Amino acid sequence: MPGNGPAPAARGLRAAWRHRGPLACALLPLSLLYRALLGLHRLPYALGFRRAGQAGIPVIVVGNVIAGGAGKTPVTLALARHLRDSGWSPGIVSRGYGRSTDDCREATPESAPADVGDEPALLARASGVPVFVARKRIEAVQALRARHSQVDVVISDDGLQHLALARDIELCVFNDDGIGNGWLLPAGPLREPWPRPVTAVLHAGACPPTDAPAFAMQRQLAAEGVNAHGERIPLAALRGRPVEAVAAVARPEGFFSMLASEQDLALEHAQALPDHYNFESFQRLGRNEDPLVCTEKDAVKLWRTHPQAWSVALQLQLPPDFWALLDQRLQALRRPRA
């Protein structure tokens, strides 16, 4: 499976995060400094000098405590669909990481990722619910409710460390790496100490240490791809052909592995590009006539120059016990408003 991957420095650091080896130990003093800075950030809230903004409706925070992708966006999509199907009117707020703008704005299915961020652009296209972005999430919530008065529950995407927005439910998502070596950045992958109190833990690999209810996520790729023209193709139709795959996500190797193992595709080339890559200078490694496959997040940017690329969605399944817990918590929050 020829192709390029993350920079050697990034690969080395991620490898170091799995163990408490020489490199991780050398970085440990910086982790102690990082922990002190975290404490200073939280102190005004702990002492009551700063207060979290109140949304006025239930807020579900989806986040993680590890650096890099953990699968938050598929969880946010699954939540939005479940809530909508359960009679709620959800809305989504996000910071909009990587965008060229800095204001509070709505992300629509037509929004460019450069204007709202990659994840909000995907959420706006795929969720069917209103999405707003702002650096201060409470501003996004206020704008969301002002324009969409029917919204009665908010999902905050990647908001676990954003203390300025009060929350009722916290969901912490873990990928296959779990907590790695258990150390804080940069000696380890943790953005904050773990374990910490949360409503529930959602994990793709082994369950991390926690006292919270924990639920295993089942992830798989969709069985078909879609291009910029809305045409669809079963991935099975690509078997036996040389396929080029590209991914600009936190863990591109996971996407490539699933294409090969789940869909039995022969990846002639696999390009792993930096997360949030803009694709303006993207060049194919293979022949133009060979199928080009990409992640759902990358599709809108790639389609500007390669509309024939096949976007493959990541599908997520969560156990019934998780949905029962979520519904129970939300009903308890809804009763006072009945």
Swiss-Prot record:
Keyword Thylakoid among record annotations = no
- One GO CC annotation: plasma membrane
Task: From the UniProt record, list the reaction(s) this protein catalyses.
Answer: a lipid A disaccharide + ATP = a lipid IVA + ADP + H(+)
Q: Which residues bind ATP?
A: I66, A67, G68, G69, A70, G71, K72, T73
In what pathway does it function? Glycolipid biosynthesis; lipid IV(A) biosynthesis; lipid IV(A) from (3R)-3-hydroxytetradecanoyl-[acyl-carrier-protein] and UDP-N-acetyl-alpha-D-glucosamine: step 6/6
Check the record and name the InterPro entries matching this protein: LpxK, P-loop_NTPase
EC number annotated for this UniProt entry: 2.7.1.130
Q: Which SUPFAM superfamilies match?
A: P-loop containing nucleoside triphosphate hydrolases
**CDD domains registered for this protein in UniProt:** SIMIBI
Q: What are the alphabetically sorted keywords of the record?
A: ATP-binding, Kinase, Lipid A biosynthesis, Lipid biosynthesis, Lipid metabolism, Nucleotide-binding, Transferase
Kindly list the biological process annotations in GO that this record carries: lipid A biosynthetic process; lipopolysaccharide core region biosynthetic process
- Annotated Pfam families: LpxK (PF02606)
Molecular-function annotations in GO: ATP binding; tetraacyldisaccharide 4'-kinase activity
Q: What job does the chain carry out?
A: Transfers the gamma-phosphate of ATP to the 4'-position of a tetraacyldisaccharide 1-phosphate intermediate (termed DS-1-P) to form tetraacyldisaccharide 1,4'-bis-phosphate (lipid IVA).
The UniProt entry's sequence similarity note says:
Belongs to the LpxK family.
Q: What is this protein called?
A: Tetraacyldisaccharide 4'-kinase
Native organism: Delftia acidovorans (strain DSM 14801 / SPH-1)
Q: What is the lineage of its organism?
A: Bacteria, Pseudomonadati, Pseudomonadota, Betaproteobacteria, Burkholderiales
* Gene (name only): lpxK
